[in-house]
Amino acid sequence: MNSEQEYYISLIDRLRQLPVETEWLEYKMNNYEPELIGEYISALSNSATICNKEKAYILWGVNDKTHEIEGTSFSPKKAKKGNEEIENWLAGGLKPRVDFRFIEVNTEKGKVVVMEIPAAVNTPTSFKGTEFIRVGSYKKKLKEYQEKERKLWLSFEQKPFELRVAMENVTASKVTELLD
């Protein structure tokens, strides 16, 4: 097992220890409807900013009630919307562009797909022209929650871009490579 897989297994275990889904964490089993994923990216990205988190996550293969790993049949590399790969299709609907990642992790109890979603920076993340937010564990339209929208804009002002984490879980050699 490589260090990236070990990191994500540890991350999955830490996230599963949280008592409930949060405004920056969503569990799914096999529901990978592209439209919903796009809306969740917007909601989780915006909520991560309000919650002062660098990233938000969707975990496929984890039961949202028990937090037990049950495995998923979702394979993001094979998933499509029409004839288009799901990653490309999702990226085209997000504004600003969001550098989300799908990571497939094989655990002892089954496959888990982790979607890492960066927190919104400088402007709310929208999907197909609509900005979403999490209210508890529910996805809602941001415009319907003016107090959340105000908090989101205040969050952009509180942490300058230069103080944000550029990348996580990167080896020293990778940092050197990226700087060259």
Predicted feature locations:
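Conserved N-terminal catalytic/coupling substructures associated with nucleotide/phosphate chemistry
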Residues: 1-180
